[in-house]
Amino acid sequence: MSFFNRTAFAAVAATLFLARPSLAAEWTIDAAHSTVGFSGMQTGSPFSGHFGKFGGTISFDPAHPEAGHALITIDIASAATGDRQRDGAMPGRDWFDVAAFPTATFEATRFVATGGNGYQAIGRLTIHGVSRPETLPFTLEISGDTAHARGHLDLVRSAFNVGQGPWASGQWVALAVGVDVDLSAHKGG
């Protein structure tokens, strides 16, 4: 093959590759039927709460999970546990410091199938200005144009500088925090 033919072939191949449609479908989160919750221990007693405001974009095809991407943003000020004192303290500087860090984000840069309806979202979680690699294992059920994903992630809050001053040690509020994600989404928006 001559230089010209090899160059032409390479150009056509590159054009076809770059012009191919994305393998991942676009999904819109149905916030009314979704929750992002958290749980922990305070003075030996369990507590749980949720974030009332969150959203994001998800591109995912279970046949090609490696082509997926997601960016989820959580409004930290929307955290609620039902305990007036705890809910009043969470937005403050000793905890989430929402004036300086109003949102948390999880950006999944790839997905991995783990068998059956199990997957992992691999990416970066940013809370309180600290960004760390995290993997969220989840299960996925798809029925027509509706998807339902459930996942759980265990975090250490001090790794994200959440809980300062007297709260930093874990003596009063445990360092371990569970995050539960229960998302419904619709294909194509």
Model features per residue range: what roles?
Residues 1-9:
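Bacterial N-terminal signal peptides that target proteins for export
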Residues 8-19:
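Bacterial N-terminal signal peptides
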Residues 23-189:
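Low-complexity, acidic/polar, glycine-enriched regions of mature
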Residues 2-3, 17-21, 189:
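N-terminal targeting/secretion presequences
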